[in-house]
C-alpha cells in the first residue's frame, strides 16, 4: 500500500541560499520515525505516565526540563512569543488534543502519511471551542482531504462533545492526497484559540493504521468543509481507535484524563517555590526553572548568566567537557520500563559525544501566566527569527532523508539530542537505573539539596570543615583553604604544590612535600631524632624504645646441617636429628600389648604392630574391636589405634574426650550448660576454668593461697612425646664424654672417670668389684646407720635379679655377707692401728664364686669345675671377718653341696673365721682355705696389698678380694687405684664391664684386656662359646642347641652338627604359626603371643590408674600412662636421667592393708634408719608379704622389654615380663596361682642356671654333662611349714612364691641377730636338707 503525503505550499519554493532545515511537521516516509530529535532530555517530568494496554500511552517527559519550540515553517514575519507548537515527539506519535484550561493552548493537527483512516476526537466545554477546533482541523486537513472524512460528533458527560473525523482511503491506487498548507492561516487560527484558553480540556483520539505510526502535518486552514457520503465510503473504512491525552505545554502523554490533569496542575500551574520544593523532595534539581519573577519579566533576547544550565559545557571552547545530558535523566526518580508500542523503532543516533545543552531564555508572558523558557541552539545566539514564508517545509520527501541523518546534518534550533528519547520503546534495558559507581559520590550529589540525605552522626564532627571537591575533612579552616587551593583545576585526584612545580595524586604526598619548604616536620620522637608528618607514625616508632616490648628474635638462618649435641654426628635434616636423639634417651614409650616389646620410635612400633595383624580371608583384615574390614594392613592398623585412647574423661553431650577432669568440666560449662563449676571458697567468685580460679585465689586471697594450693595441687603439664631439654642434653653430653663404650673387639673394662669413683657420704652407694681369681664381688657400704638396709637390698638384688652374673661369667650365684668394723680404721690410722669405734664406717663384703667355664679354664687356677660355697654364718663378735669359701674339687667330680643340688651339703663346707686373735699389729687378714692350710692377704697401713706366695696360687685356691671402700663422712675421697688389686694372673677373666658399674655405681679398677676377651663379641653362647653380634641370633642359636656339639630345629625333627645348617633350615619355619586362637583367625609363633591375644577377647584390664581411673591390660602400660600423663617431668619414676654412677634407688613394697605398717617400713628403709629395731622389724614381718627390690638404670638402650614363658615342673606355664626400665621381672600370668604384685622370682632346679644379659634373664642354660631337656623347666619349691625361719602365717602366705620366702628368710635372719645364735645353724641346715640354697644375709649389730 502506498503512502499518502501531505505537502505544504512552501515545499516547492525553498528559500535561496538557505539550507533545507527539518521542520517539526515533517513526515517520516519510509522510515520508522518522523523526527529523530526533540527536547525530551531537557524536559523530563518527575512523574511517569501510565500507559494503557495498547502500549502507546507513555510519558515522554524524561528530561530535566520541558522545552517548547518555535516553528520554523511559519510564514509570518512576527514572532509568536505566546504560541507553542508541538515538538517532534508529539508529531511522530499522532494527533494531540489541546488543553485549554492552562497557559496558551497548543493546537495539534496531523495527517497520515499512509492511506489509513485517522479518527480525531476533540472534547470541548463550549460550542465556540468546538467550532474553533473544527475550523482548525478543516483548514489543516484541506478541502480536498476533508471531502473523504466522516465527522462524528457525540455528547459526553457535562455537555462536552466529541467530534471524530474518519479519514478514508482514496478511491485511486493510493495516490497521495496533498493540499497546500498555509502557515500564516495556522498562526491566525492558533491566535484565535488562545482567546479561549480558559475553556475546558479537549482531547483527541488518534486512529493509527497497521502500516506504521502516523506523523502529523501542519496544514493551512480551509473553509467550507463538507461532509462526505457515508454510504459510498463504508466499504473502504478500517478504523483503529487509540485514545490518548497529551499536554500542550510539554511532551507528557497519558491514556487517562485524570492523570493528565494532575500532571498539569503539578507541573504547569504551581508557584515556582512550591515546584522547587516538590522537586527537592524527589531528590533532583530542576535547573531550568525560574527563581524570581523579575527574570520572567525580562525580554526573550536578554541574556543572564544565572540562567546558564552548565557554564562549563557552554563556555568550554576546547570541547573537553565531560558533561553528558543522559546522566541527568535518572536524577529525580527511577525510570520505569516503557511498554512496547506497535510503531516501528525510531532510528538510533550514532554513538558519539553528546551535544551541549542550549541556553534557556525566558519569554514575555502575560501577568499571572507561567511560561516555559525558550531554547536556543547556541548560547551566544539570539532567539531565532521567523522564517520566510517561502522556507522549505519539512514535509517534503527530500527532507525525510535529511531527517534520517541526524548526526550529519544541522539540527533544527531548539531540538536537543537525547539518547533516552530516541531509544526504542521495546528495549527495556535502555531505561534501567544506571549502576552506582563505587567510591566517592558524584559531584552533582554534593549540593545543598542533597545534604538532608546525608548521614548525620549525633556526635560532633572532629573535622568539621569539608572539601567539596574530594570530600576530605579538616580540623581548621586554614587547612581546608590550603587543601582547596592545592587542587589542580578542581580535579579531586590531582594536587599541586603552591611553591614549586611538584604534582601528586595523593594529598598525603603533597603534605609531606610541603615540609621540604618549611624545613622541619611537626612531630618528633622524644628519645631520638626521628620526625614525621603524622603523629601516629611517631607513636608507632616510640614502641621501639619501650622496655616492655618484646623484641623479635633474629630469624635463624636456614641450616643445611644439624649436628647432634651429644655425639656430634651431623644430619642433613632436623627430622633425622630428632630421630637420632631418641637413641641417646633411655625412654621407650611405645610398648606392644601383644608381645611386650617396647620401642623408642613410633614408626618402628607401628611397623612391629603390623606383624600381629592376620588376614581373615582373601587377604581381608578385620578390626579386633569392631566390625571394620579392609584390605590394607596399614589402614586397619590406623583404625585400630583410634580405638585406643588415653583420654578417659568423655563428655556426655558430644564426642569430646580429655585426659583431665577439670578440662571436661570446663568444656561442659562453656559448650553446653553455661554454668561456672569452679567456685572460690573465700568469696562469691566462680568461673568456668580451673586456672582462672587459681589465679583469682592467688591475687585476691594471697594470704590463703598457700593453704589453698596444698589442698588443690596443680597438675603438671602432660608430655606426649620425648622431649629433650637443655638440661637433659647436657646430662647426655656428660654421659657420652665420661663413660664412652669400648669397641666391640675388646669388651674389657673401660677407663673409669673421676666422677665414677666419687660418692657422697650422705648417700653411700654400693660399690661392686670382681676378683679374677675367685670371681669375688665386694660391696662397700659406708655409713653405720645405712649399712644394714643398703646391704640387705643389694644382696637381695644380686641374689634374685643376678644383675652382675653375666659380667662375672658365673652360673651359680652364691652370696656371702661378711661384716667388719675396723678395716677402715686399720687403713686410715698410722701404723695400722684401729681408729676409734665411732669413726669407722662398716664394710660389707659380698663373695661370688667363680663358675666353671671357658674363662676359668684358661686361667691357671685348677680344673674347670663349679666350686662349692656354703653359707655358714658364724658367731661374730664386735670385730672380725668371716671369709666363707670351699676347697677346690677334683676334676670330673661334682660338688656335693652345689647350690642347685637337692642333697644336703652341710658338712662339706668349711668356714674359717679370722678373729682378733689372728690379727697382728698393723695387719689385717682375709683367710681362705684350700683344705689343708690357710692363706692370707696382708693389708698394710699404706693401703698396699701383700700378695700370697706362688705356691698358694698353684694350689688353685680361690682368693677373695678385699677393697677398702668406706671413707669418713666429712671427707669423701675416691679410693686410690693402689688399694684395689686383683690377685692372680692378668690373663684371667675380665672384670666388671661398664654395664654393671653404670647400673650399680661400681668402682671398677682399670685392667688391660686379655687375649681371650678381645675376640669375643657382645653376645656369646655359654655352651659352645660362639659369639654373636645380636641377642636375637644368639637366642635362636640357644634354642637350637641339642647338646654341646649338636643342633636341632625346635619346630621339626631336623638336626645337624653345624649351626649354619640349622639356621638355614629354621628360616623355612619363620612363617609358621602353630598356635591358633579358638575365637578368631589369629595365630602366633609361640604361646605367649597367643595368651596376650586372648586378653583382647576377654577385655580384661586388671591394672587401674589411681589418679584418673583408666584401666589397662598390662602393668607396663599403666606405668607408661602414669609417667606420661601424671609425672611432673615426664620421666619414669626411679629412672635417673644420667647414666653416671649414682646411688642405686631402692624401693620398699609391703603388701598389706595397714597403712601404718607401710609407712613405718618405708620410712625406716629410706630415711637413713638402716638398722631396724626389734619392735619395728617384728611389726613389719607380721604382715603378709614383704618384698624388697631394687630398681636399676637401663644398662643397654637398645634392649627392649620382652616376655619369657616358663613351664614349671608340675606342668604349669608362667609368663614373666622383663622390662628394660628397671630390670624387674613381673609375673604376667600363672595358672592356678594368684598374682603377687609386683615381683615374682624363681629358683631353678638341678642342672640349670639362668643367664643374665645386662640385667635381663635371657635363657636357661644346662650345665656340662647334664641331661638335655627339650623344654626348660623351672620348679617353684615352697618353704615347708616345719621351717621356723619365719612364722607360720608368713609361710602360708608365701607358699606360692620362693622369692617371698627368701625375702622373709633374710629379714628373719636379720631379726635373729637379736636373738640366740644357736638357732641360726639349725635353720640353715633345715634349708639345706630341703635342697634349696637360700642365701642368707648376716647382719651384725655394732
From Swiss-Prot:
Regions of compositional bias (Acidic residues) in chain numbering: 297-327
One biological process term from GO is: neuron projection morphogenesis
Q: Which residues carry this modification: Phosphoserine?
A: 976, 992, 1007, 1153
Q: Which UniProt keywords apply?
A: Activator, Developmental protein, Disease variant, DNA-binding, Intellectual disability, Isopeptide bond, Metal-binding, Nucleus, Phosphoprotein, Primary microcephaly, Repeat, Transcription, Transcription regulation, Ubl conjugation, Zinc, Zinc-finger
Cite the GO molecular-function annotations of the record: histone methyltransferase binding; RNA polymerase II cis-regulatory region sequence-specific DNA binding; transcription cis-regulatory region binding; zinc ion binding
Q: Name one Pfam family in it.
A: zf-H2C2_5
- Region (Disordered) residue ranges read 1-102, 201-228, 274-442, 732-763, 964-1013
Question: Compositionally biased, Low complexity: which spans?
Answer: 34-49, 986-997
GO cellular component terms, alphabetically, are: histone methyltransferase complex; nucleoplasm; nucleus
PROSITE patterns found in the cross-reference section: ZINC_FINGER_C2H2_1 (PS00028), ZINC_FINGER_C2H2_2 (PS50157)
Output compositional bias ranges, type Pro residues.
740-753
Ranges of Polar residues compositional bias?
Answer: 201-217
Composition-biased stretches (Basic residues): 346-357
Protein's cellular compartments: Nucleus
Query: Which family does this protein fall into?
Result: Belongs to the krueppel C2H2-type zinc-finger protein family.
Which disease relates to this protein according to its record? Answer: Microcephaly 10, primary, autosomal recessive: A form of microcephaly, a disease defined as a head circumference more than 3 standard deviations below the age-related mean. Brain weight is markedly reduced and the cerebral cortex is disproportionately small. MCPH10 is characterized by extremely small head size and death usually by 1 year of age. Neuropathologic examination shows severe loss of neurons as well as neuronal loss of polarity and abnormal dendritic maturation.
**What name appears for this protein in its UniProt entry?**
Zinc finger protein 335
Q: What organism is recorded for this protein?
A: Homo sapiens (Human)
Amino acid at each position: 500500500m502506498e503512502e499518502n503525503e501531505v505537502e505544504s505550499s512552501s515545499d516547492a519554493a525553498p528559500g535561496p541560499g538557505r539550507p533545507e532545515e527539518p521542520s517539526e511537521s515533517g513526515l517520516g516516509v519510509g522510515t520508522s520515525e518522523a523526527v529523530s530529535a526533540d527536547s525530551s532530555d531537557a524536559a523530563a517530568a518527575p512523574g511517569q505516565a501510565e500507559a494503557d494496554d495498547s502500549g502507546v500511552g507513555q510519558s515522554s517527559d524524561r528530561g530535566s526540563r520541558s522545552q517548547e519550540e518555535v516553528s520554523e515553517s511559519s510564514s509570518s514575519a512576527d514572532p509568536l512569543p505566546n504560541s507553542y507548537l508541538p515538538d517532534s515527539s508529539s508529531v511522530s506519535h499522532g494527533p494531540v488534543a489541546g488543553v485549554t484550561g492552562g497557559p496558551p493552548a497548543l493546537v495539534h493537527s496531523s495527517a497520515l502519511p499512509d492511506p489509513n483512516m485517522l479518527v480525531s476526537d476533540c472534547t470541548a466545554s463550549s460550542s465556540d471551542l468546538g467550532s474553533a477546533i473544527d475550523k482548525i482541523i478543516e483548514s489543516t486537513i484541506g478541502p480536498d482531504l476533508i471531502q473523504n472524512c466522516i465527522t462524528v460528533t457525540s455528547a459526553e458527560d457535562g455537555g462536552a462533545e466529541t467530534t471524530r473525523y474518519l479519514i478514508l482511503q482514496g478511491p485511486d491506487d493510493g495516490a497521495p492526497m496533498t493540499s497546500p498548507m498555509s502557515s500564516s492561516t495556522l498562526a491566525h487560527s492558533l491566535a484565535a484559540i488562545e482567546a479561549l484558553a480558559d475553556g475546558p480540556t479537549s482531547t483527541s483520539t488518534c486512529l493509527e493504521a497497521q502500516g506504521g505510526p502516523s506523523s502529523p502535518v501542519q496544514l493551512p486552514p480551509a473553509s467550507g468543509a463538507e461532509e462526505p457520503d457515508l454510504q459510498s465510503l463504508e466499504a473502504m473504512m478500517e478504523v483503529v481507535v487509540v485514545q490518548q491525552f497529551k499536554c500542550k505545554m510539554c511532551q507528557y502523554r497519558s491514556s487517562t484524563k485524570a492523570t493528565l490533569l494532575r500532571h498539569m496542575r503539578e507541573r504547569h500551574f504551581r508557584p515556582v517555590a512550591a515546584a522547587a520544593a516538590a522537586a527537592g523532595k524527589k531528590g533532583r534539581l530542576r535547573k531550568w526553572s525560574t527563581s524570581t519573577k523579575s527574570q520572567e519579566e525580562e525580554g526573550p533576547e536578554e541574556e543572564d548568566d544565572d540562567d546558564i544550565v552548565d557554564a562549563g559545557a557552554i563556555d568550554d571552547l576546547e570541547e573537553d567537557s565531560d558533561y553528558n545530558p543522559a546522566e541527568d535523566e535518572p536524577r529525580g526518580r527511577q525510570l520505569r520500563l516503557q511498554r512496547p508500542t506497535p510503531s516501528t523503532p525510531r532510528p538510533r543516533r550514532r554513538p558519539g559525544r553528546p551535544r551541549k545543552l542550549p541556553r534557556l531564555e525566558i519569554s514575555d508572558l502575560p501577568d499571572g501566566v507561567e511560561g516555559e523558557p525558550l531554547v536556543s541552539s547556541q548560547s551566544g545566539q539570539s532567539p531565532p527569527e521567523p522564517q520566510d514564508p517561502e522556507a522549505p517545509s519539512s514535509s517534503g520527501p527530500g527532507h525525510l532523508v535529511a531527517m534520517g541523518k541526524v548526526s550529519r546534518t544541522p539540527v533544527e534550533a531548539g531540538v536537543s539530542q537525547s539518547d533516552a528519547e530516541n531509544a526504542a520503546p521495546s528495549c527495556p534495558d535502555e531505561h534501567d537505573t544506571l549502576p552506582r559507581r563505587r567510591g566517592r559520590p558524584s559531584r552533582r550529589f554534593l549540593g545543598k539539596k542533597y545534604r538532608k540525605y546525608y548521614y548525620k552522626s549525633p556526635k560532633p564532627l572532629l573535622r568539621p570543615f569539608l572539601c567539596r571537591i574530594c570530600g576530605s575533612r579538616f580540623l581548621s579552616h586554614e587547612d581546608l583553604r590550603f587543601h582547596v587551593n592545592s587542587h589542580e583545576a578542581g580535579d579531586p585526584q590531582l594536587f599541586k604544590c603552591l611553591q614549586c612545580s611538584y604534582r601528586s595524586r595523593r594529598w598525603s604526598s603533597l603534605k609531606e612535600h610541603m615540609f621540604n619548604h618549611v624545613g622541619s616536620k611537626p612531630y618528633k620522637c622524644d628519645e631520638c631524632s626521628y620526625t614525621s608528618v603524622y603523629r601516629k607514625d611517631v607513636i608507632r616508632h616510640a614502641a621501639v624504645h619501650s622496655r616492655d616490648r618484646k623484641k623479635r628474635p633474629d630469624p635463624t638462618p636456614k641450616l643445611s646441617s644439624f649436628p647432634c649435641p651429644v655425639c656430634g654426628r651431623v644430619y642433613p635434616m632436623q627430622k633425622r636429628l630428632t630421630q637420632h636423639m631418641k637413641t641417646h634417651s633411655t625412654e621407650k614409650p611405645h610398648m606392644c600389648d601383644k608381645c611386650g616389646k617396647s620401642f623408642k620410635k613410633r614408626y618402628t612400633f607401628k611397623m612391629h604392630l603390623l606383624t600381629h595383624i592376620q588376614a581373615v580371608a582373601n587377604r581381608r583384615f578385620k578390626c579386633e574391636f569392631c566390625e571394620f574390614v579392609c584390605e590394607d594392613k596399614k589402614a586397619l592398623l590406623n583404625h585400630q589405634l583410634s580405638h585406643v585412647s588415653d583420654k578417659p574423661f568423655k563428655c556426655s553431650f558430644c564426642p569430646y574426650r580429655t585426659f583431665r577432669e577439670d578440662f571436661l568440666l570446663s568444656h561442659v560449662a562453656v559448650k553446653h550448660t553455661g554454668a561456672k563449676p569452679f567456685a572460690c571458697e573465700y568469696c562469691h567468685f566462680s568461673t568456668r576454668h580451673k586456672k582462672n580460679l587459681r589465679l583469682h585465689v592467688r591475687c585476691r586471697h594471697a594470704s590463703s593461697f598457700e593453704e589453698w594450693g596444698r589442698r588443690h595441687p596443680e597438675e603438671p603439664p602432660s608430655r606426649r612425646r620425648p622431649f629433650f631439654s637443655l638440661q637433659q642434653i647436657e646430662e647426655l653430653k656428660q654421659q657420652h664424654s665420661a663413660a664412652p663404650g669400648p669397641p666391640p673387639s675388646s669388651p674389657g673394662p673401660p677407663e673409669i672417670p673421676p666422677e665414677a669413683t666419687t660418692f657422697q657420704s650422705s648417700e653411700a652407694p654400693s660399690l661392686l668389684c670382681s676378683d679374677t681369681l675367685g670371681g669375688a664381688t665386694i660391696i662397700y657400704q659406708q655409713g653405720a646407720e645405712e649399712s644394714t638396709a643398703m646391704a640387705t637390698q643389694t644382696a637381695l638384688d644380686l641374689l634374685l635379679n643376678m644383675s652382675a652374673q653375666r659380667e662375672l661369667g658365673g652360673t651359680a650365684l652364691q652370696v656371702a655377707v661378711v661384716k667388719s668394723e675396723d678395716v677402715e680404721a686399720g687403713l686410715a690410722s698410722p701404723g695400722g692401728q684401729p681408729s676409734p669405734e665411732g669413726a669407722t664406717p662398716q664394710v660389707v663384703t659380698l663373695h661370688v664364686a667363680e663358675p666353671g667355664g671357658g674363662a676359668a679354664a684358661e686361667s691357671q687356677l685348677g680344673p674347670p669345675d663349679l666350686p662349692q660355697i656354703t653359707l655358714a654364718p658364724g658367731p661374730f663378735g664386735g670385730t672380725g671377718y668371716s671369709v666363707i669359701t670351699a676347697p677346690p674339687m677334683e676334676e670330673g667330680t661334682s660338688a656335693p653341696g652345689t647350690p642347685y643340688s637337692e642333697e644336703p651339703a652341710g658338712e662339706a663346707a668349711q668356714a674359717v673365721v679370722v678373729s682378733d686373735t689372728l690379727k697382728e699389729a698393723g695387719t689385717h687378714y682375709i683367710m681362705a682355705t684350700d683344705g689343708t692350710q690357710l692363706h692370707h692377704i696382708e693389708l698394710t697401713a699404706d693401703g698396699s696389698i701383700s700378695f700370697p706366695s706362688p705356691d698358694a696360687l698353684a694350689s688353685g685356691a680361690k682368693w677373695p678380694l678385699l677393697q677398702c671402700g668406706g671413707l669418713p663422712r666429712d671427707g669423701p675421697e675416691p679410693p686410690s687405684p693402689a688399694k684395689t688389686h686383683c690377685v692372680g694372673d692378668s690373663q684371667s677373666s675380665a672384670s666388671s664391664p661398664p654395664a654393671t658399674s653404670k647400673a650399680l655405681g661400681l668402682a671398677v679398677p682399670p685392667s688391660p684386656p686379655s687375649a681371650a676377651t678381645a675376640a669375643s663379641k657382645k653376645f656369646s653362647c655359654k655352651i659352645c662359646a660362639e659369639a654373636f653380634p645380636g641377642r636375637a641370633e644368639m637366642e635362636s642359636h640357644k634354642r637350637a642347641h641339642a647338646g654341646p656339639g649338636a643342633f636341632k630345629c625346635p619346630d621339626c625333627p631336623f638336626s645337624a652338627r653345624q649351626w649354619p645348617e640349622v639356621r638355614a633350615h629354621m628360616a623355612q619355619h619363620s612363617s609358621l604359626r602353630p598356635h591358633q586362637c579358638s575365637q578368631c583367625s589369629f595365630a602366633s609363633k609361640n604361646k605367649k603371643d597367643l595368651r596376650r591375644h586372648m586378653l583382647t577377647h576377654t577385655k580384661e584390664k586388671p591394672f587401674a590408674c589411681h589418679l584418673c581411673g583408666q584401666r589397662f591390660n598390662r602393668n607396663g602400660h599403666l606405668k607408661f600412662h602414669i609417667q606420661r600423663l601424671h609425672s611432673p617431668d615426664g620421666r619414669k619414676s626411679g629412672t635417673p636421667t644420667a647414666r653416671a654412677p649414682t646411688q642405686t634407688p631402692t624401693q620398699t613394697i609391703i603388701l598389706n592393708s595397714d597403712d601404718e605398717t607401710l609407712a613405718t617400713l618405708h620410712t625406716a628403709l629410706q630415711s637413713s634408719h638402716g638398722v631396724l629395731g626389734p619392735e619395728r622389724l617384728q611389726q613389719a614381718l607380721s604382715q603378709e608379704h614383704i618384698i624388697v627390690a631394687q630398681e636399676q638404670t637401663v644398662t643397654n638402650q637398645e634392649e627392649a622389654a620382652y616376655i619369657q614363658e616358663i613351664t614349671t615342673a608340675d606342668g604349669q606355664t608362667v609368663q614373666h615380663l622383663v622390662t628394660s626400665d628397671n630390670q624387674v621381672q613381673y609375673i604376667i600370668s600363672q595358672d592356678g596361682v594368684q598374682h603377687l604384685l609386683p615381683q615374682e622370682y624363681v629358683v631353678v632346679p638341678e642342672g640349670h642356671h639362668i643367664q643374665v644379659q645386662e640385667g635381663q634373664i635371657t635363657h636357661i642354660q644346662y650345665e656340662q654333662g647334664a641331661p638335655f631337656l627339650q623344654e626348660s623347666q623351672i620348679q617353684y619349691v615352697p618353704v615347708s611349714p616345719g621351717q621356723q625361719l619365719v612364722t607360720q602365717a608368713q609361710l602360708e602366705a608365701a607358699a606360692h612364691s620362693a622369692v617371698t620366702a627368701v625375702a622373709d628368710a633374710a629379714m628373719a635372719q636379720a631379726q635373729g641377730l637379736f636373738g640366740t645364735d644357736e638357732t641360726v645353724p639349725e635353720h640353715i641346715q633345715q634349708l639345706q636338707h630341703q635342697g634349696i640354697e637360700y642365701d642368707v644375709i648376716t647382719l651384725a649389730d655394732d
